[in-house]
């Protein structure tokens, strides 16, 4: 995991329940049922993730500058 991915992971973990975060073309917020909700700007894609690492893994598909994520390295 590169520095950009680590920084993003840290920012996501600091989100409060009523906070949100914009990254590229995605709106990320803490879900009231736990975890994180990720919605695309055009609202054509909505995903729910149990933890911040999964969010970073998902975003790395769209932003190659995040590098290889923990999930990809384990594969």
Where are these regions (language model features)?
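Negatively charged, low-complexity tracts enriched in Asp/Glu with abundant Ser/Thr
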Residues: 1-22, 69-73
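Generic detector of intrinsically disordered, low-complexity, polar/charged segments
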Residues: 7, 13, 31-32, 64
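Enrichment for repetitive, rod-forming helical segments
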Residues: 11-13, 37, 61, 75
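Acidic, low-complexity, intrinsically disordered interaction modules
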Residues: 18-63
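Short, surface-exposed secondary-structure junctions/capping segments
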Residues: 58-75
